[in-house]
Structures are given as structure tokens and as C-alpha cells.
Amino acid sequence: MSGEAPRVAVDPFSCPMMTMQRKPEVHDAFREAGPVVEVNAPAGGPAWVITDDALAREVLADPRFVKDPDLAPTAWRGVDDGLDIPVPELRPFTLIAVDGEDHRRLRRIHAPAFNPRRLAERTDRIAAIADRLLTELADSSDRSGEPAELIGGFAYHFPLLVICELLGVPVTDPAMAREAVGVLKALGLGGPQSAGGDGTDPAGDVPDTSALESLLLEAVHAARRKDTRTMTRVLYERAQAEFGSVSDDQLVYMITGLIFAGHDTTGSFLGFLLAEVLAGRLAADADGDAISRFVEEALRHHPPVPYTLWRFAATEVVIRGVRLPRGAPVLVDIEGTNTDGRHHDAPHAFHPDRPSRRRLTFGDGPHYCIGEQLAQLESRTMIGVLRSRFPQARLAVPYEELRWCRKGAQTARLTDLPVWLR
């Protein structure tokens, strides 16, 4: 027999400003209601949230649940609803919007670029980027007498400059990085579409993309000349092998997607990770293994995305006795499964030495985040640079006063992180 999921009145897509001492109660409410709960979707109509860890892993691996945005309710549009809607000729090059063999082909193209050994070879360069950014912030703080602000000044710039470096895109300083991200977001490239739903600014302003296009094409043309071993070169070689040929536009689309994926959620997480380190929760004599465990616990405790991106039922599906119609929008509650007391003792506490490493922060199944190794490397490298170069670094406000918020179901982030680096 099949029936309906329990309906939960709380809104999973709104979150008041929070402090570090408080977590949203919605996840506990979902878990108590059942493994599958029904909620109101942002654009209206029903949506379903998976709250149970084992069921979540089943759903994320089930080919009946797909990322195809064509199955989304027709009333949904753009970034307000967390959709990625690439133009048809570019969809085969979009990891987060294709399934099945198309997705497996893209994974084969991208996987060599994220080979752990290849990434480890760039550790010194990644450390140099972190060192430069932190030193510039420390010098500015010394001159002004004000604490450095590490969210806007470091947490987002660091992974952005790293991914651009790895791709061979010559974005070399924070000002260039901010401009590039502003243009990409306005166009809706490489990530969820803009709020206007058509790739333009909702107000009708079309940004000047010529400077950014020049930088992206510079990376693509260098990759075609075989005079570089960047990620873009690897993508080009693999795409040629899979598709026979690949255009400049297609390569540009792939690398813009990696620029977004390589900095936005990572920047959110690094803010939380920095807060935990600067609050003194990492032992002064922590070795590499202890730092890795610390990062793992931060990933469990502070997932930068509280829910997965949308999936849709490709056909009618019954899970745990609940019937989902074709096209049913489905989310997995990442934060809720990460803090399930059935898998973790004191699940809402931050314990770096806890034995269980069970978490869904990077997803599961075929769409498991391909950039996990890079995010982990950036996290460990950042901690190493901070502790070796700025051993006196400390929070400028009490940990308990740090505030964070969410943007719908998509990202959780600290509003600011004032720090005395020296």
C-alpha cells in the first residue's frame, strides 16, 4: 500500500538570522515527522524532503530521480527555485543538469582534472594564494587599526582565485575576482539562472562581458595550443576524446561551471571552518591527521548547502510507502541527516574526535561532488597557512556573537568574520 507523506507546517526555505550557538529547528521537526515529508515549494505546489540517511542515499543513487529541469513544475523559474536551465546546445556540458550516460560522459571528462595526485602537486601554489590574501588583509588591518573581515576579504576570494589558477584563467587579484563573479551571476552562467529566468539581470541591465570572455578564451586558447597543463587543458583533451570535437563556447561553459562550483559553496564552508579554528577548537599541536579530522567534523556540522539541489521523479515512485507522482520535486535534508542522533552522539555538538564520519555534505550517488578533494585540500592548506604565518590570529568578537543566515535552500553562510590576524 502507498499513501501520502506527513505534511510539515514549518518552512524549510526561510531561516532567520542565527548565531553560532543556535541551529534551525526545522531539521529536527522533519526527522520526527518521518523519513519523507511534504512541504510547500518556494514557487507553490508540493515538494518532498527526504530526512532519513539510509533513504537519502537510496534516492541519490536511484535513476528514477533525475536532475532534468524540464521535469520541474512549469511555474518554477531560475535561481529563486534553485534550478539550472542551460540553453539546449550547452546542456550536454552541464554536470548538474544531466543524468544517465550523458552525466557519466561528463564525469569521465572532469575526473582526471580533479585527480588527487594532480591536485596535491599544486599545494604550494594554493598555499601561496592563501598567504598573499591573508598578508594583504593583515597589513590593511595594521594600517587601519580595524580587524580584518575574512568573509568578503578571504573566504570567497581564496577558493575563487585557486580554481581560476588551476583552470589557467588569469584572474589574479580580488578585484578581478569580484568583477568576474558579478558578470557570471548576472548572466546566470555556470550555475542557477538569474532571478529574471532568461539569463539577464531582472532589472533589464545586461553587463559588459567582454573582459571576462577575453580571460576565459585566453585559458581555452592556451589549452588548445598544448602549451599548458591546466585543468582546462585536461578538460579539452577529455572532451575531444568523448565528443570528437569541442567548441570554444562549450569549453567556456564547462569552465564557468567549475568557477562557480569551485568557489561559492567552498567559500561558505571556509567561513564556518575559520570560525571554529579561531575559536580555539583546534589544538595548538594538531598534526595533519588531527587537522583532517577537524575539517571532517566541520563539514558534518556546517554543511554549506542545507539541502541537495532539486531532483525530480522521472516516473511515479513509491518510497517508504509514500507515492510520489511523476515530476515530484525532491530534496534531501543534508543538515538533518548530518545531525541524526541515530548515527552521531551529541549530534549538534562540535566534536572533532567523534568516531563517525557519516555525512552527506558532498552528496552521494552518481552526482557526488567531483570537487571534494579540492575543497578538502583548500581547507587543510588554509589552516596550515593561518597557523604558521599568523599564530596570534583570533576572533575580534565572541564566537557566540557571530551571525549566519541562509539564502533559501541553497547556501548557509556567515554574515561577517572580524579577526585580528596579528
From Swiss-Prot:
Temperature section of the record? Optimum temperature is 30 degrees Celsius.
Is Chloroplast among the key words of this record? no
Q: Which cofactor does it need?
A: heme
- Regulation acting on activity, per entry: Strongly inhibited by dithiothreitol and high ionic strength buffers.
Q: What's one GO BP annotation on this UniProt entry?
A: daunorubicin biosynthetic process
Localization: Cytoplasm
Which pathway does this polypeptide act in?
Antibiotic biosynthesis; daunorubicin biosynthesis; Antibiotic biosynthesis; carminomycin biosynthesis
> From what superkingdom does this record's organism come?
Bacteria
What main location does UniProt list? cytoplasm
- Describe the function of this protein: Involved in the biosynthesis of the anthracyclines carminomycin and daunorubicin (daunomycin) which are aromatic polyketide antibiotics that exhibit high cytotoxicity and are widely applied in the chemotherapy of a variety of cancers.
Checking PANTHER family in the record gives: CYTOCHROME P450 YJIB-RELATED (PTHR46696:SF1), P450, PUTATIVE (EUROFUNG)-RELATED (PTHR46696)
Q: Hey, which family's this protein in? A: Belongs to the cytochrome P450 family.
Q: What protein am I looking at?
A: Cytochrome P-450 monooxygenase DoxA
User: Which organism does this sequence originate in?
Assistant: Streptomyces sp. (strain C5)
What does UniProt list as this organism's lineage?
A: Bacteria, Bacillati, Actinomycetota, Actinomycetes, Kitasatosporales
